[in-house]
Amino acid sequence: YESPGMQKYMKDLRPTVFADLIAMNALYRPGPIEYIPSFVRRKNGEEPIAYDLDAMEEYLSETYGITVYQEQVMLLSQKLAGFSKGDADALRKAMGKKQKAVLDKMKPKFVEQASEKGHDPKILEKIWTDWEAFASYAFNKSHSTCYAWIAYQTAYLKAHYPAEYMA
């Protein structure tokens, strides 16, 4: 939270809840960082919160319609395409380890099964592309929460007890 880039984004964001800190921690990484301007605008009411599919709102409302965490990919793959918990975890692992061959096998399954549930294949292709763009650097929420909590505590100490903090 101390880099100039993160400080700029945090000022723009004007966080009001701890969940904002958690999300920013997860987003400030290669790949997901491109979603920060939209995340900030949506949080501040400067851009409408939109979902590629209405069915995604359940899992993306807390992050203003943007997929931020690995868990969201897992839950959405289950909801949209009927992936089993095992398939969803395999998807998470493949994205996290950048296993392109595994992802290339899973994509048609995702698109086909989600299409069978009535979702537009073109929108599904966009969703998958978005997931691929962010997922190789995505945090799980618990990881992001721990780092955000440490940053929050550090900022508090720095602001209220600067001499003790620096000692």
How should each PLM-predicted stretch be described?
Residues Y1-A167:
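Noncatalytic, beta-rich nucleic-acid-contacting surfaces in large DNA/RNA-processing enzymes
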